[in-house]
Amino acid sequence: MSNLFKYLPSVDSVLTRLEEEGVIDGLPRTLSRDLVNGFLDVCREEIKGGIITEEKQLSPDVLFPRLTCHVRAGAKPHFRRVLNGTGVVVHTNLGRSLLAESAVKAVTEACACYSNLEFDLKTGERGSRYSHVEKLICEITGAEAALVVNNNASAVLITLETLAKGREAIVSRGQLVEIGGSFRIPDVMTKSGAFLREVGATNRTHLHDYENAINEETALLMKVHTSNFRVIGFTKEVSGGELAELGRKHDLPVYEDLGSGNLTNFSGLGLMREPTVQEVVAEDVDVVSFSGDKVLGGPQAGIIVGKKKYIDAIKKNPLNRAVRIDKMTLAALEATLRLYLDPETAKREVPTVRMITEKPENLKKQAQALARTLRRELGETANIGVREGVSRVGGGAFPEQDLKTFLVTVVPSAKVTVEELKEGLLSTEPPLVGRIEEDAFCLDPRTLTREEYKLCAEAINQILE
């Protein structure tokens, strides 16, 4: 084994050949050298592990194709496009919502050009970045005032820090949710300086539970919408309207965190009823917060709406500077919100809303079109079929609720297994993510555009050929 190490090429000789072949054109010399060193380290480990056992395995004709693949893979951007064939619309691991075309255009312009981010074009003086979206948000939701921060966790943090720091916030025990990434409402509350006062039981909380807990240290009544899980059976929760009435009786602000939140009524899709932001604001809840990049279909943002006196207080919190949104988020959010001025336009132009509301008959046609593309590209290397299935909204919204869809199934006819196909597709360019059901690799056209069908076929062909 030890003799095999001497047949490994030198770094400089490898770099020379890579340059001659044009493999590292445009790459910094240091990056190229690091990639080559990394590949040679892999070869050394393979010699030690008994994977490379013969001199011919280290010949240039054998090593160079592997090296080329290694270098090209290492030179690719780490953050890149992925084809989402999972059918999960707001896939939190694949970037959440897709932006509308107008929002993409607005972001591009904001990046490439100077703008009136904090400049009042009427007076020629300094302006507020929030002026670009506050009026829009209020018009759509019916709220008196609004503020946008960088995500909904920040919205919860700054709201609690402003309205309840050093005092108690009363919350139902059944609403102490974990919002993802191991971040929990009690932890956020602790960080804000507010003290948690739990009331009720896990499955049932009554209005009198809140009222009995009110004391001289109470600063806030809080309701957390459990959008990412369901408690079913013997349950009871207090509505935002009831809590708002109790708050007025005791001169206490009421805050509702809607989580994913939505501006669209999705009734008629077979999904359980979820309150819209407009409905919660209409219940006279003082402060409401929700996400911008989930069911709403915009960029990552935390949107806070409500009574002007409370929103103004939150705006003045020094923490607002630390959690404010940047110009790209602002541009994307304004463009997205403008689409919501007409609900039908939003359903048509906001990709997230369009995908959620797509009719099953249209999805069947899309699945058939995708299947035809795959058959043309793959030939006899795989059996392609279409069958009924389910999609999910994702993003912590409508948990355990299914949307009817049609899946395209791929079963390799050769030596590649379904599991190997799924794993191999993660390394194609672009990577393709799907799911395995009933011994078949499945693609859901709900989360794929027609322009991506050929890319899916080419990716699968790379693994099967």
Swiss-Prot record:
Pathway: Aminoacyl-tRNA biosynthesis; selenocysteinyl-tRNA(Sec) biosynthesis; selenocysteinyl-tRNA(Sec) from L-seryl-tRNA(Sec) (bacterial route): step 1/1
A Gene Ontology term for the protein's cellular component: cytoplasm
Enzyme Commission number(s) of this protein: 2.9.1.1
Modified-residue entries (N6-(pyridoxal phosphate)lysine), positions: K294
InterPro entries assigned to the protein according to its UniProt record, in alphabetical order: PyrdxlP-dep_Trfase, PyrdxlP-dep_Trfase_major, SelA-like, SelA_trans, SelA_trans_N_dom
Keyword presence, Cytoplasm: yes
NCBIfam families the record matches: selA
Protein family (similarity comment): Belongs to the SelA family.
Name of the protein in its database record: L-seryl-tRNA(Sec) selenium transferase
Natural source organism: Maridesulfovibrio salexigens (strain ATCC 14822 / DSM 2638 / NCIMB 8403 / VKM B-1763) (Desulfovibrio salexigens)
